[in-house]
Structures are given as C-alpha cells and as structure tokens.
A protein has these predicted regions:
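A short, hydrophobic C-terminal helix/tail in secreted or cell-surface proteins
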Residues: 297-302
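Noncatalytic, beta-rich nucleic-acid-contacting surfaces in large DNA/RNA-processing enzymes
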Residues: 4-296
Length: 302
C-alpha cells in the first residue's frame, strides 16, 4: 500500500509539472457534477495563469478539454443541462457539422433539450460566438422552441403518413429584438449561477486596480496542507489578530437578531479569487450597515 501511494504521488507530480492543463482537465472531469468544486479549481487555474474559456456549443466537448493555452468548459459542467442531453448535442455536431446559428442549433437538438437547458446555455455564454447578445437569445428562445416542437411533431406524423407530406427542413428565422445586452452585473450574475464562477469577466474587475495596497485576498484562503490533486502547499504570513485589508464586492448579507435585541451580520465578500464570509458584530454592523445598501456592483474595503 505504501509503495502504491508513492507511485501515485510520483505520477501526480509528474503530470502536474509536465502536463498541467491535461492534469487539471482530468481533475475537473472527475468532478463534472460538483459545481462548487469546479469553481475552486477554476480559481486555481487563474492563479497559475492557465486560461479558462467559456462553454461554446461549437467548440466545447462534453467535458473539460485542453484548447490552446488553457481549458475550455465542457457543456456538461453547466448547472441544469443534464449530462445525457449534452452528450447528444456533441454527437449531433460531430455527425452533421457545426451549428450555423441559434435556430439551427435548436432545430437539430430540439428532441433532447428543454427550456431550462437552453436557458442555462444562454446564461453560460455557450452561444456568444454566434453573434447575438445573450439578452436577445433569451428573448426569442421560448418562441423558437414552440415553433420547432410543432415542426418536429409534423415530421413525426409525416413519417407515419402514406402521403409523405412535405415538411419544412430549414430552421425558422429568429426575430431578434433590438435590445441592449444585460448590464454587467446581471450578465455576470447569471453566468455564475450556471457555471459556479465568473468566466467572461468579474464584477469587481473594474475596481481591483484601486485595491493593490491591500494585504489580503481570498486566494490566501487556499488549503495550507498539500492539496491531494494539485500537490501544492500554500502558506502565508498573516497571523491571528493581524489587521487585514481587502477589496471586494458585497455579494450577500445575512442579518441575525441577537439575544440582546441588536443586529449582527454575516457578510459575503467576493474578489477576483473567490469569496469569504465576514462577521460583523452589532457595534461594527451599526457603523457599516449604510454601506451594505449597495448592490454587488459597489466595491467596499472592509
């Protein structure tokens, strides 16, 4: 057993050093249905300057894959899509070629997709390369799916008909409204809701340059013992009772009434590396509560 563990440790170290992207792809694919763990390793990749590419119906495989200088999200990694359905999407693309546009995708995949799956793909940016805005895809997908479901039903009936009715073979055109993209906060929030992490940007990104003198960020919260997958050991010099400063956005505030009738709060702060929950006891909460009225596009130093 000791010998086997040593062999595994050596193999892990070798792969991590010489094939880091392939190694991490394997790690992520072992956790393809655990979105919180995927988020942890995506943050790790960003720290190691390994590019993370968003899902794309014409470029992604079912699982995470190495592409260029980084890894691309697999379609199966999105929350709410279903592994079986995404494998069928990949199979359709490999058999009949790239999807020409959004209606073409829906027409060819309508039999194994539902509205929630399509919505998740939109939120995750899987159609961005097709040239329209996510807000436009969201505006038309339900109507398109209804029309395509009716066409598909006609096709099924025609196959059973003696007369072989002529049925529309081309995808119907989408009537995209001329509307702006969602604002940055909403776009990134929806993206994170299905990917577990921000990929195309970060709501704190516009403010990060103003916080370079802070002595703490959430990347320092990595495990201090050796990580079983990456083999890394992480240590830092911040000690208990040290004063720390960090820059981040207020992502969530959970207020609690204390026994004495005062209010304290648990505040989730997000920065470019991840998130951390801070505790504001009643005296501190009373001082900062006015700052917590901002939405997540406001940066606060705590």
């Amino acid at each position: 057993d000791v010998y086997k563990r040593q062999v595994v440790t050596y193999q892990t170290a070798y792969l991590k050093k010489y094939y880091p992207k392939e190694f991490l792809a394997g790690v992520l694919n072992n956790r393809i249905d655990k979105i919180d763990e995927i988020a942890k390793y995506v943050v790790y990749m960003k720290e190691k300057n390994i590019a993370v590419y968003p899902p794309d119906v014409n470029k992604s495989k079912a699982y995470f894959s190495v592409q260029g200088d980084g890894l691309r999200f697999g379609l199966c990694a999105l929350r709410g899509v279903g592994i079986g359905a995404m494998e069928k999407v990949i199979e359709e693309r490999e058999k009949n070629g790239l999807f020409k546009d959004f209606p073409d995708f829906l027409m060819r995949c309508i039999r194994f997709l539902n509205k929630k799956m399509v919505e998740s793909l939109i939120f995750g940016g899987a159609f961005d390369s097709m040239g329209k805005r996510r807000s436009q895809y969201e505006a038309v997908y339900e109507d398109l799916m209804k029309r395509l479901a009716a066409i598909d039903k006609q096709k099924m009936s025609a196959q059973m008909s003696l007369f072989g009715d002529i049925i529309q073979e081309e995808a119907p055109k989408a009537n995209y409204p001329d509307i702006p993209e969602w604002d940055t906060t909403e776009k990134l929030s929806r993206e994170k809701s299905v990917l577990g992490v921000y990929v195309s940007g970060h709501p704190f990104g516009a403010y990060a340059a103003h916080f370079t003198d802070c002595n703490f960020h959430t990347g320092l919260l990595a495990d201090y013992e050796e990580d079983e997958e990456t083999g890394d050991r992480t240590y830092h010099q911040i000690k208990i009772d040290d004063k720390v400063t960090m820059g981040g956005i207020v992502a969530a505030v959970r207020k609690i009434n204390t026994k004495s009738g005062t209010i304290m709060a648990f505040i989730t702060i997000e920065d470019l590396y991840g998130s951390v929950e801070c505790v504001a006891f009643p005296r501190i909460y009373d001082k900062i509560k006015s700052c917590l009225l901002y939405t997540s596009d406001a940066a606060d130093e705590l």
